[in-house]
Amino acid sequence: MKNKVRVRRARSTDAARIAELSGHLGYPTTAKQMKARLKDVIEDKEGACFVAESGEGGLIGWIHVSTTPLLEVERRAEVNGLVVDETARSRGAGAILLGAAEKWARGKRCKSMSVRSNVLRERAHGFYLRNGYEHYKTQKAFRKGL
């Protein structure tokens, strides 16, 4: 699969498929909602969304990466989401998407890239470890509606 996967920047016309794939990650949404979110991401100069297309031209995955200037550490990027279609996993598409995000982050002068992964996603943890990431922290996440 590696040599049959093409990565490109996401376009607004990808919204429906990105929404469908988001459901695989446990974040169901509608195509309409995703189109609005994707518009914001596409226009954000501090973020990027890349998609992976199979050799047959179907969209099989996406990655969203962003960077924020920080006071406490050198500039770093963060993977906000990465998903590959369940039928296309373990064939290299995720690593190719991760590579595209890392290249983008280096172009933004980032010194590192981090990712947060649910403690239940053990398969994902192995993926990140195999791709050179290290487990460096365990934390609790808090949120408040505004």
Model-derived segments and their meaning:
Residues T138-G145:
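Active-site/acyl-donor-binding loops of N-acyltransferases
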Residues A10, L82-V84, S117:
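Hydrophobic adenine-recognition pocket in adenosine-nucleotide-binding enzymes
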Residues A95, V119-T138:
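Conserved active-site alpha-helix within GNAT-family acetyltransferase domains
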Residues V84, S90-K103, G126, R130:
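Conserved acetyl-CoA-binding loop-helix of GNAT-fold acetyltransferases
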Residues R9-R75, L98-G99, Y136:
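Acetyl-CoA-dependent GNAT
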Residues R75-E86:
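Conserved acetyl-CoA binding element of GNAT-fold acetyltransferases
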Residues V5-R6:
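Extreme N-terminal starter segment of soluble prokaryotic enzymes
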Residues L98, A105-S117:
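Conserved GNAT acetyl-CoA-binding A-motif
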